[in-house]
């Protein structure tokens, strides 16, 4: 699932292709197809939860940017250079370096020893708002967005339906992320 879809090549999983600035991602099924896409100067996007392609593709660099807040299986031996993004990775153990993702003056720092700042479970404070900034599923079911990324919304405005239940904005502002239509969600996601 991708929330910030306008800046993520992962949306190619649902759209077959995705562009972010001057980069184009193309959905592929295997290593051979990935190699063809790379030869065209484009980025292959592959659904591979176990990262099995690493064994046959032998990449020079692996970047785990799943943002799961924990390491789901990335190993420092996966490639000559392995990067973990966000909490859950320990530089020198799980990967060669970690990129800090916590909002603030350390955002984007490269960590060569130790780990990223642990996940607090609370979004960064912007203008006095933390959890209110999130749009969460009100019920299990299919996601039906009403608002789109970039829309200005008011507090209390209907922004989506999940499992046919309404989801309302908890604050006024601009929608910066929204799951795509027709994905299965669970309450609270």
Give the label of every model feature segment.
Residues 1-189:
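Well-ordered secondary-structure scaffolds
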């Amino acid at each position: 699932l991708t929330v910030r879809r306008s800046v993520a090549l992962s949306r190619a999983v649902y759209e077959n292709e995705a562009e972010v600035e001057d980069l184009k991602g193309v959905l592929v099924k295997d290593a051979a197809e990935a190699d063809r896409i790379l030869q065209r100067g484009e980025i292959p996007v592959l659904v591979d939860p176990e990262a099995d392609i690493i064994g046959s593709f032998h990449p020079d660099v692996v970047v785990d940017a799943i943002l799961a807040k924990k390491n789901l299986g990335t190993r420092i031996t996966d490639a000559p250079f392995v990067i973990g993004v966000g909490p859950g990775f320990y530089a020198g153990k799980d990967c060669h370096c970690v990129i800090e993702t916590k909002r603030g003056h350390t955002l984007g720092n490269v960590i060569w020893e130790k780990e990223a700042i642990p996940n607090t479970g609370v979004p960064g404070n912007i203008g006095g708002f933390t959890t209110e900034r999130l749009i969460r599923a009100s019920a299990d079911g299919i996601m039906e967005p009403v608002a789109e990324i970039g829309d200005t919304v008011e507090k209390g405005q209907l922004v989506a339906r999940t499992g046919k239940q309404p989801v309302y904005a908890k604050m006024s502002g601009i929608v910066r992320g929204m799951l795509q239509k027709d994905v299965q969600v669970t309450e609270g996601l």
